[in-house]
Amino acid sequence: MTSPEHSEDERQPLLTKPSGPDESQSGFGSSWIQFRKPSAMWLLPMYTLYAITAGSLIIPEFNATLGLICHQRHSPDNSDFQLALERCDGNTQVQSDLSQFYIYGTVLSGILGAIAGPNLMGFSDKIGRKPILLISVLGPLIADIIVLAALHYPDEVDVKWLLVGYAMDGLSGSIITATTASQAYISDISAPEDRVSSFSYIQAAFTSAFALGPLIAGGLLSVFDSLIQAYWLAFTIHLSLIVLFTLALPESLKSTAESRGTEENTTNQPKAEAEAGFFEVISSARGLIPSDRSSKTNMYIVAVTEAALFGVSMGLVPLQLAYSAYMFHWRSSAQSAFLTGVNLWSILVLVAVVPLFMSRIQRRQQAEGQSEGQPQTAFGPGELGTIRTCLLLQVAGYITIAVVHSPLGVIAGSLIAGSGAPLSPTLTSCLTKMVPEERQGVLLGAVSFLHAISRILLPSGMNYVYGSTVGTQPYALFALLGFGSGIFLVASMFIGNKSTLPDIPRFPYLMNYSSRS
């Protein structure tokens, strides 16, 4: 609740005569303070560069791991690394060893990430978002060094050392923690009604990793014809990001503490919570448990849906490539064009459609005068309807792929499912409005924990289903994904919201019919 002092200050004129020779009120000082104010425009370019770099390493990482396994395990007498890689291309034993290695790396990184991510985000409420973003880059940087050492000295550095890179990646939180820390940064500096649009830009940057990353990697490999140059470039970018996060990015939490008094609230928290140990992962989940039953149900549905969506997105891309290669014999060029086209469409929806739609809803709300005197709710105007509409689009997209067994069906179904890209930022925005401002880091840390768990379970389950059915019904996986999305769509109908504003009036069956508050 706003204090009387704040109310008086807000009624003062914006422009007043300077009372003294205060530098902060001079033209230069005021401009510099405004320039260094925390803003999404500071964060988004850095996060986008981070995400695209991670995406551009997908192909080089695959080839480097495959080449090292082939050279060290199956062609130890062959001194030519590239020639050994070409000879092992169709070796089923090499493919089996590669698959087993990826399982070890994924489980190791996922478990360590599940431990480190929530605690790092919990610490961010005390030490700020910048240090966490900085830590999230250290793991990939160390992994780059290990891979470079293995590529330069393939006979001396065993491929098992790459697992140390996976471990460092997990301990630093990597892209998962960088994403949640970026979302916390946005939450610190934005009003609740503006978060969907801001989170959409974060999601668009994350999607750009899959859209632009493989294209960049393919271009680098075609120009340099070597994996080493690609990793040296990634090393340079990660090193530059450390400098940018340290020196250029303004801290968001300090500004929030000064303006909203969160620093005082933090000191009043129970001492036991403030002294929670690093490995007490479950303590972070307390940010997900509201007191009343209705809010608790809402948060469970939203959090589980968001975590499942993340797990599916992490495991779906390689299976889409495998399905298209098996069914339609698509090769690298066709697969790259397919992934780029689908992800660019998702980016367009995120950066153009969602902000325009949400701004239109807010303008209509202000024009009708409905925002005055209304309590803040977890689901703003249009948000609950957006969640249900996106889930419906994903159901339709996956079912289209499962039913229409043709290249056109895969493309159309993927574009339809890609139209549901606003689902993740909308869910995250709603989650941040369910807890106090001083608990944002703890909340997003718990979300990071769920992400790490779903990153292990769902891709493993999807690979098992596809491997078990590819010989008879290769489209069964997409039918299962459509069924799962349908379950979450039904669950979203049980979400309650004490709001007088309807969601997306054009779709009355998707509207929120809860009673007026």
Curated annotation (Swiss-Prot):
Biochemical pathway: Secondary metabolite biosynthesis
Identification of the protein by name: MFS-type transporter avaJ
Provenance organism: Aspergillus versicolor
Intracellular or extracellular location(s): Membrane
Region: Disordered, residue numbers: 1-28
Gene it is expressed from: avaJ
Keywords, sorted A to Z: Glycoprotein, Membrane, Transmembrane, Transmembrane helix, Transport
A single GO cellular-component term on record: membrane
Glycan attachment positions: N63, N265, N497, N512
Keyword Transport: yes
